[in-house]
Amino acid sequence: MIELDHVIVNARDRVASARLLASLLDVPWDETALGIFSAVYVNPGLTLDFITTDEDFPVEHFCFRVSDAEFDAILKRLEDAGIGWRGDVRGRNDGKVGTAHGGRNIYWDEPDKHRWEILTKSYARRPG
């Protein structure tokens, strides 16, 4: 089986971006895990390696499948942090939760404009 091991995430401030995501997801992180990277340990098999850059970089989208309890906890942490969210990939933050595809999902944008998503039921699986 092929598994995704790590992803490099560009940021204006790798430490601040990694710290914020780790706190929202309630996962461990390391400010200087690999020298120039601040690592967010999403799960035992996936690390997001944040790197600081002054160069232009594209806005990326990252989605995490979570349990209902994790969804509720992350939503509460977003609310406590004053970070807005929405139930649709486009549009303004309206505090709504998406319910398409038989689960719940929300999107939020972080300071570098990357678009983060959590969902309780994947809609991206190949049928069969």
Ranges and model annotations:
Residues 16-18, 69-74:
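Short, conserved charged micro-motifs
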Residues 2, 8-48, 54-55:
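Core segments of cupin and vicinal oxygen chelate
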Residues 81-128:
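Vicinal oxygen chelate
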Residues 36-38, 60, 102-106:
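Short beta-strand micro-motifs in enzyme catalytic cores
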Residues 1-15, 61-62, 66, 122-128:
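N-terminal beta-strand motif that seeds the catalytic metal site of vicinal oxygen chelate
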Residues 22-24, 75-80:
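Short amphipathic alpha-helices in soluble, non-transmembrane regions
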Residues 1-3, 55-59, 99-100:
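Short glycine-enriched loop/turn motifs at secondary-structure junctions
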